[in-house]
């Protein structure tokens, strides 16, 4: 009789937090049939590469055709309430007040001393609703602390376990989505979706699986992220793979993603920044609009000083021969 044994790591998001065990994402039912090489990504098992392809082939497919990557370990927080915009404008370096509903912005998140401890994307879901997508669960607790200090009227909810997401990246990604995505007249179609915008849509028809698709990514290629409920994840994976079978689509893991994001100059916590450097030193000074954001935000005073006296500089090296 065949027996199956699972493997988990116990970890804490903070020193005083309860331990949590590594979990599977909604896409595991499909990805586990294609690879046994999984890595622990902040509490979730995600593929490092796939048996039939390997890191180099997956990297090449993203640059030339298309890949799909499970990124469900990203933390998602819903920020709701009359003071939601005030909170996010105060806690992020970006000017959140410039966002319109349906827009996405990449931002740094800093301590009072100007050091950057997380980054992510902020989606404006409604007039009083935002979704913060980032790398670390601590960001949610930190947002709650800041809201309490300022007496903001907001609800902050961790929605990570209710929202899974895959990243569809590569030159053929738009063509793949257009084959099976239905968008209502009130939402932008896939062909109309602009960079750093999102659309609310469904699979194939009005009664199909509900999705959100954002034109975002972590590879430097044309790309999108597909957001769904974990219970719908296997069917969504099937639809993506079926639509991409004639477009050179293959699954890719974290190994290829690391190569892609380094080439694109995209930073990762624990590598290019670590809670000690500021956004200017980490190469994302564009996320700190000191001249145009007149409102106060956490770290502003020290970021003004640190911009004038950087201690480090992140640079990219292009290798022209072996």
Identify the residue ranges that each predicted region occupies:
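Conserved, structured C-terminal
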Residues: 1-50, 123-322
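Well-ordered mid-protein domain cores that form the structural environment of catalytic cofactors
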Residues: 90, 94-145, 149
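Short amphipathic beta-strand starts and helix->beta connectors
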Residues: 55-64, 109-119, 148-152, 205-213
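Acidic, proline/glycine-enriched N-terminal capping motif
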Residues: 1-110, 115
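Acidic active-site catalytic centers that drive phospho-/nucleotidyl reactions
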Residues: 70, 119, 225
């Amino acid at each position: 009789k065949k027996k199956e044994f699972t493997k988990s790591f116990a970890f804490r998001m903070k020193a005083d937090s309860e331990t949590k065990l590594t979990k599977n994402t909604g896409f595991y039912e499909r990805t586990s049939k294609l690879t046994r090489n999984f890595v622990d990504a902040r509490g979730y098992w995600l593929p490092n590469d796939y048996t039939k392809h390997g890191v180099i082939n997956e990297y090449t497919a993203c640059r030339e055709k298309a890949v799909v990557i499970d990124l469900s370990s990203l933390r998602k927080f819903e920020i709701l309430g009359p003071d939601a915009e005030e909170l996010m404008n105060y806690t992020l370096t970006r000017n959140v007040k410039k966002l319109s509903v349906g827009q996405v912005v990449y931002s740094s998140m800093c301590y009072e001393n100007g050091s950057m401890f997380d980054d992510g994307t902020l989606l404006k879901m409604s007039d009083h609703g935002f979704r913060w997508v980032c790398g670390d669960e601590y960001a949610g607790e930190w947002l709650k602390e800041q809201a309490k200090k300022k007496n903001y009227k907001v609800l902050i909810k961790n929605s990570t376990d209710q929202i899974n997401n895959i990243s569809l990246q590569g030159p053929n990604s738009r063509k793949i989505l257009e084959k099976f995505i239905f968008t209502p007249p009130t939402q932008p179609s896939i062909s109309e979706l602009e960079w750093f915008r999102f659309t609310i849509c469904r699979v194939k028809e009005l009664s199909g699986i509900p999705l959100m698709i954002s034109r975002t990514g972590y590879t430097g290629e044309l790309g999108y992220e597909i957001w769904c409920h974990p219970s719908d994840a296997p069917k969504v994976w099937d639809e993506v793979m079926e639509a991409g079978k004639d477009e050179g689509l293959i699954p890719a893991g974290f190994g290829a993603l690391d190569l892609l994001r380094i080439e694109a100059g995209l930073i990762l916590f624990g590598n290019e920044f670590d809670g000690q450097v500021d956004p200017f030193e980490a190469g994302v000074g564009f996320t700190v609009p000191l001249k145009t954001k007149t409102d106060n935000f956490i770290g502003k005073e020290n970021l003004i000083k640190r911009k004038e006296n950087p201690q480090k500089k992140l640079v990219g090296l292009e290798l022209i021969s072996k």
